């Protein structure tokens, strides 16, 4: 079944539930923490998903989004959902690779560097990841990729040697390890704190998408963005499994249908947002373009090291994902 067909069926499911007046036992409100700003496309898709569920259940289940880390900081969201502090939320799961190496499958440098390859990798990993999350009291609803990750600096960089000693914003194990290999100093900084970190000199560089740089107006502190297309990490919307199991079938169907639509819309927006945000970085004075051949070769060598390390940490489960990806 094609993605467009799946989306159509999902929309019909949601529409049918609205027409039938899908009902839950009692009206509920679920708060949905999100780490990124309200203007970020992930947050916009999340808000539309929330509205879809609210409408699809006839208001019996209202989901209220809280973007920008306003309810829980990014690093706290997964635990908040697991423990039932909230019933739903969005999180970048690669930030939890220290819990289980599989969470970092989408941040293996230079494995999947395009949207098409990212989709193939997600197809290979979705089953094992869903099972892993279920074991942590989490039910996966949908996942949306970021645009490809590039390198931001406050200066021109032509080789890894020039990165030595630079303070580098990290957001997961992969970014911290990349910094270490390049001789940079990793500093853990959540998305909501990026602008302040660069303005105050806490960080001088990062690897992220054009989307994050645009949302945080990093041109106020940084000067260069290198398109290295290292990986396309994903944000995941998850529900507390006990809360999910407590919903009636009709409400679950609405949420599943809205999730399919959200993932489809998120994929499309991520693709469209890529060129737009890179153009905006350039319009605001940043130097934007591919990294030089020498720097690219050095970074890919780091990628080979990090791939081997990830496979060692993830074991047979990780190898199965890579094998399934390569088979496609």
Protein language model features and the residues they cover:
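Sec/Tat signal peptide C-region and signal peptidase I cleavage site
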Residues: 20-27
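Bacterial N-terminal signal peptides that target proteins for export
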Residues: 1-13
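Hydrophobic helical h-region of N-terminal Sec-dependent signal peptides
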Residues: 14-18
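N-terminal secretory/targeting leader peptides
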Residues: 27-118, 125-129, 133-328
């Amino acid at each position: 079944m094609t993605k467009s067909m799946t989306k159509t069926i999902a929309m019909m499911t949601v529409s049918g539930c609205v027409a039938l007046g899908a009902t839950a036992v009692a009206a509920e409100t679920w708060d949905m923490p999100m780490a990124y700003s309200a203007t970020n496309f992930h947050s916009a898709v999340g808000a539309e998903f929330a509205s879809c569920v609210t409408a699809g259940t006839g208001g019996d289940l209202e989901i209220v989004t809280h973007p920008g880390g306003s309810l829980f900081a990014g690093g706290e969201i997964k635990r908040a959902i697991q423990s039932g502090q909230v019933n739903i939320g969005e999180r970048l799961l690669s930030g939890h690779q220290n819990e289980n190496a599989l969470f970092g499958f989408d941040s293996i440098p230079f494995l999947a560097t395009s949207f098409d390859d990212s989709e193939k990798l997600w197809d290979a990993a979705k089953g094992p990841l869903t099972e892993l999350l279920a074991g942590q009291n989490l039910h996966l609803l949908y996942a949306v990729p970021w645009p490809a990750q590039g390198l931001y600096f406050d200066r021109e960089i032509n080789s890894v040697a020039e990165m030595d000693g630079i303070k580098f914003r990290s957001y997961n194990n992969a970014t911290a390890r990349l910094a270490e290999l390049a001789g940079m100093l990793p500093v853990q900084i959540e998305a909501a704190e990026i602008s302040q970190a660069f303005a105050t000199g806490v960080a001088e560089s990062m690897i992220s998408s054009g989307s994050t740089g645009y949302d945080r107006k990093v041109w106020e502190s940084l000067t260069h963005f290198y398109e290295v297309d290292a990986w396309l990490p994903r944000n995941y919307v998850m529900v507390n499994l006990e809360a999910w199991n407590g919903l009636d079938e009709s409400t679950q169907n609405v949420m599943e249908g809205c999730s399919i639509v959200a993932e489809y819309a998120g994929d499309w927006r991520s693709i469209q947002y890529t060129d737009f945000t890179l153009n905006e970085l350039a319009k605001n004075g940043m130097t934007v373009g591919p990294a030089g051949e020498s720097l690219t070769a050095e970074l890919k060598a780091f990628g080979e090291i990090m791939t081997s390390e990830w496979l060692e940490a993830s074991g047979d489960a990780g190898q199965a994902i890579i094998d399934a990806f390569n088979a496609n």
